Design a protein with these regions (language model features):
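A conserved regulatory-domain signal marking ACT and ACT-like small-molecule sensing domains
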Residues: 2-102
Length: 102
């Protein structure tokens, strides 16, 4: 089961860049992490954070948190779609929010 992208706050047509948080769950597989990073790299982005854990339950489930910052909204959408298409991925939850100027 996959989840649609959730936008926090009011959508803004003026948002040049966004922050995207992806929470992925899948059965443990040694080749999963490279398959999750590949679509990000192909789109020219570098993750701000990647954290993988199999600490909960019996260890047969891998949860991965992947964060992107400073990416175009379209890039965040494409990454989300690509993550959902990765073989073995059970669920992808995404939160995308406009970046605030400092």
């Amino acid at each position: 089961m996959t989840s649609p992208v959730a936008f926090t706050g009011a959508p803004s047509a003026q948002a040049d860049t966004v922050r995207a948080f992806f929470f992925i769950s899948a059965p443990v597989d040694p080749g999963l992490l490279p398959r999750l990073i590949e679509p990000v790299a192909k789109l020219g982005a570098v993750p701000t954070r990647v954290h993988a854990s199999r600490e909960s339950g019996d260890g047969s489930e891998l949860t991965v948190e992947l964060r992107l910052t400073g990416v175009a909204p379209r890039t965040a959408d494409l990454v989300g779609r690509a993550l959902r298409a990765v073989v073995g991925v059970r669920q992808v939850m995404a939160v995308v929010e406009p970046e605030r100027p400092d």
